[in-house]
Amino acid sequence: MAAPLDFSNQSVADFCETIAAETSAPGGGSVAAVTGALAASLTAMAARFSKEQWEDAPGAVAQAEALKARLLPLAEEDARAYENVLLALRMPKEVDEDVRDAAIGDALSRAADVPMAIAEASVDVATLASELAERGNQNLHGDAAVAAFLAEAAVRASANLVEINLATREGDERLERARELVEIVRRITRRVSEARS
C-alpha cells in the first residue's frame, strides 16, 4: 500500500517514518525537495535577522518563502511521478513490448521533470543563502552557510535522479542542464566555504 502523500501536515518524525517505510515512493526525490525547503526556511530565518545589515533582507525573506512554497509540494509530486513509473513497470507482460517500453519511457521522462524542478529551485536557494552569508548578519553566517550546503545536497541529489530517470534518453537536454546545475551550485558553496577560511 502506498504511503500517504500529504507530507505538509506530517511531523518531522512522521515524515521520516514515511520515508523509512518499505515502499518505493516516497524516496530520494521527496527527501531532496524537503531538504531544499528546509534550506529555504533557514535562509528566510537568516534574512529576518539581517534587516539592519542588508537593505535587501526583506526581499530575501520573501524570496526564500516563495522558494520554500515551490519546493514543498514537489515532495508529493515526486512521489506521485514515481508511482506512475511503478505502474508502467507493472504493466502485464501480455502488453505489446513496444507499447510497454514507450509507457515506461514516458513515465520516466515525466518523472525526471520533478527532480529537475527541485534542482532549479534549490540552486536559487543556494544563491540566496550565499548572498546572506556574505552580506547578512554575520552572527547568522553559519546558518546561511548551512542553508547553502543543504541546497547543494538537494541539487546534487535531484540531478542524480534526473540522470537515472533519463538514462535511456541520450541527448536529452535535461541531462546537460542537470550537470550544469551541479556545477553552478558547487561554485556557490565553494565561495561560501572560502569566505570563512
Regions from the language model: what does each represent?
Residues A2-Q10, M45, L128, N165-A167, ...:
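Polytopic transmembrane helical bundles with strong interfacial aromatic enrichment
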Residues E52-E55, L132-L140, I164-E176:
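Inter-helical turn/loop segments and adjacent helix faces that build the functional surface
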Residues V31-L38, A60, L67-L74, A111-A121, ...:
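Amphipathic alpha-helix face/heptad-repeat signature
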Residues D78, Y82-S158, N165:
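Amphipathic alpha-helical interface segments
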Residues A21-A44, N139-A157:
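Conserved phosphate/anionic-ligand binding catalytic regions in large, soluble enzymes, centered on
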Residues E52-M91:
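A structural-propensity feature for long, helix-poor, extended segments
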Residues S158-R169, R174-S197:
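C-terminal auxiliary extensions adjacent to catalytic cores
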Residues F7-P26:
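Short, hydrophobic/aliphatic alpha-helical segments
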